[in-house]
A protein has these predicted regions:
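Structural motif
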Residues: 1-2, 23-28, 50-52, 60-63, ...
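A generic, well-ordered mixed alpha/beta core segment in the N-terminal half of proteins
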Residues: 1-58
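Short, hydrophobic/aromatic alpha-helical segments in well-folded domains
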Residues: 14-15, 109, 127
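Phosphate/diphosphate-binding glycine-rich loops and adjacent basic-rich segments that engage nucleotide
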Residues: 35-103
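A long, hydrophobic alpha-helical segment
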Residues: 100-115
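Conserved phosphate/anionic-ligand binding catalytic regions in large, soluble enzymes, centered on
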Residues: 113-121, 125
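Short, well-ordered loop/turn and helix-capping segments at boundaries between secondary-structure elements
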Residues: 127-134
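Conserved small/polar residues in nucleotide/adenosyl-binding loops
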Residues: 137-139
Length: 139
């Protein structure tokens, strides 16, 4: 199933839990507005593009739910609101320098998990989301 013109759908594992409880395997993902720089870049090109995979496996299902960024954007927003620092190496400021300042990170860009591998996953999600829904691809 593909859903067009959707917004933030919340925690992906919520949907995976529903599927696996009905003995179904699920793979869900979505693209998002640019907030993630590809490996080696200093400007946002991809969204944080969450990925979720779930499989019923007996008593306890296997569910993997993660974004392609090193840290969830909501955590950065919360840190900004509370005046807290974010971990080193997860975001760049608008000048392309690593920052631990949440406000600067929100004005800059986030970094991908696993370097070029995370960039590849973000690109894959962006392309598949666009193709499956006949929608805009952000790249």
């Amino acid at each position: 199933m593909a859903i067009k013109k959707s917004g933030h759908y919340g925690l992906s594992s919520f949907y995976a839990e529903q599927a696996v409880s009905n003995k179904l395997m699920v793979f869900c993902f979505t693209n998002a507005p640019a907030a993630l720089a590809p490996h080696g870049a200093k400007k946002s090109l991809f969204g944080t593009n969450p990925i979720c995979f779930g499989v019923p496996t007996g008593k306890v299902p296997f569910i993997y739910d993660a974004s392609t960024s090193m840290i969830n954007r909501g955590i950065i927003r919360r840190a900004d609101k509370l005046g807290l620092k974010i971990p080193y190496g997860v975001a760049l400021n608008k000048k392309g320098r690593i920052t631990t300042n949440a406000k600067e990170a929100l004005q800059g860009t986030q970094l991908p998990i696993a370097g070029f591998k995370g960039s590849g996953l973000a690109w894959m999600v962006d392309i598949l989301s666009g193709v499956f829904t006949l929608s805009l691809i952000h790249i």
